[in-house]
Amino acid sequence: MDTIIFDVDDTLYDQAQSFHRTVKKLFQEPLSDEEINQLYQASRKYSEILFDQSEAGEITPFEWQTGRIKAACKDFNIPIDTEKATIFHETYVTEQKNITLFPEVEELLNVLYKEGKQLGILTNGEEKHQAMKIKQLHLSRWIPAEMTFISGTIGHAKPKREVFDFIEQKLDLDQTKTVYIGDHFEKDIIGAKQAGWQAIWMNHRKKDLPSHATYKPDKEVHSAKELLDLFKKKA
């Protein structure tokens, strides 16, 4: 049976929307959408760095959650202290309770489910927070709990080979029939490829392929619609 496993954040839904709403609620100085996009990209960059440090036990989860917006704001000379960063994170989490799937992703999940594909989730993050998002997106309509994997419960995070091997052994997967879909090149694409899986890069932020990349995605799409069309062609 073909198995298709999805990342969650910024793959199944637009993660930037919650960030935009949070900034517009809390920042006294109005920012344009483009300025918020730049702040969001900086926040994601620092989030990846600090998440890895948190996973290694070098900093606390709180320092990761507040540190990313503090570092991003510093880049743009926006004043913010730990108290305001805490409020930002709490508001951001609240806004994530309103997330919805990309419409084409919902259609894709319906198509794959009807075709009898085995569908799963692999997402990095803290268990409670990621579970909240999975519930908000109503992913249990297509993906059962036993096919849902959160790094915080496994003890390893992407791109470590161990997290992919864990799932492979748990589900007795055939590498040649297993596809992973994610937006993050290093964590999702390199992680899946070095484990021997096929990988589709959901590159809707239109990032450049790293020049030093030792692995390349099997397919690259730039929107949820392109992802849907890719699987419709295969049908």
Regions found by a protein language model. Give the residues of each.
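An amphipathic alpha-helix signature
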Residues: F19-K24, F62-K70, E127
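Active-site neighborhood of HAD-like aspartate-dependent phosphohydrolases
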Residues: M1-F6, T11-K45, D75
